[in-house]
Amino acid sequence: MKKALKIIGRILLALVIVIALALGVLTAAEYRPAAVETVTADHPAEAVLKAEEPLTLVTWNIGYGALGDNADFFMDGGTGVYTADRERVQQNLAGIRETLAGLDADIILLQEVDIGSDRSCRTDERDTLRDVIPGASDAFAYNFNSLYVPFPLPPIGHVESGLYTLSRAEIREAERISLPCPFSWPLRIANLKRCLLVSRIPVEGTDRELVMVNLHLEAYDSGEGKEAQTRQLQTLLRDEYGKGNYVIAGGDFNQLFSNTDSPYPVYEGMWQPGIIDADAFAGGFSLLMDPAVPTCRSLDRAYAGADPDGFQFYMIDGFIVSENVRVDGIETVDKGFANSDHNPVQLRFTLEEDIT
């Protein structure tokens, strides 16, 4: 009996040592970005932005090329971790590229773009998407960078993923601005480190800039993380608008705007998005979503072959636009969630010349 207890004790001690070593390695390798980091804006474009010219902007969470209509995901109540093999990742990326090319946008804001993650077969997805705007200027910022995510079973593994902005006009300057992380150690070490990717595009004939903010705010938190990140976003937008710049924030807010009447009720037991109070942005900004088509679907089960009636949909992708930007239209483009668990959202707008 004593011998058996000793063996069990040694096994438990060995497990504790292995876990401690693993936590030590992951802690030492934890991604710790500075509050503000300069991002290299690659591939200088030749086009310029002008006031009073119609422009088109698209935002799309592309689900790291692995969350097509076949996918379910464990964090949403499904069982999937690795949801696409290499062939399916390439199929999804090809569909995403085709859609973006057809939309012919001047600026594209993408979220969940993997550049070397196990979950998307170590694919650098920028290689497929970079020239969807010919001659585009582009910028990338990490939103998720972990040596190894050790959960669930099988574990997610290595992740390198982030926000990716493309512009027909030159991005003169870009920055990664860290957002508050709601998680403490040890969850923090293998979790997302969310940010704002701020790109500055000069407006010809003026000393103003179009300040583009690409974002993907907190999803699986108690709600405090989303709120803190939204407050920081609000401060940034007001500061830039106060300088006389044109300001647009677009992306996956993981929240519904309070001024949007969503026709998609949240069913019992499903993930619940937060709410952004539109009144908090009053006096300078408009919050825009198009509820005609859902921007996101639940990943509790695959969408292919499912009955849309009773399926969980959400409105969580959209734009916040300063008052000196005239909104000419907004549309959620219905792609049937074929290649991502989100639909792209298109904004047509004009930078107003007279902003006095």
Regions inferred by a protein language model and the residue ranges of each:
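Active-site beta-strand/loop signature of hydrolases that rely on acidic residues for catalysis
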Residues: 56-62, 92-122, 166, 199-201, ...
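Metal-dependent phosphoester-hydrolase catalytic domains
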Residues: 5-11, 18-45, 200, 235-248, ...
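Conserved S-adenosyl-L-methionine
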Residues: 137-145, 174-180, 329-333
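Solvent-exposed loop/turn segments at secondary-structure junctions
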Residues: 64-65, 114-117, 144-147, 171-172, ...
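N-terminal, active-site-proximal structural segment of metallo-dependent hydrolase catalytic domains
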Residues: 2-131, 135, 140-160, 353-355
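Short aromatic-enriched loop/helix-cap "lid" or pocket-rim segments at secondary-structure transitions
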Residues: 68-73, 122-123, 150-154, 176-178, ...
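Surface-exposed cleft-lining segments at the edges of enzyme active sites
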Residues: 79-86, 113-115, 180-188, 216-224
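Beta-strand-turn-beta hairpins that frame and shape the catalytic cleft
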Residues: 47-57, 69, 159, 163-173, ...
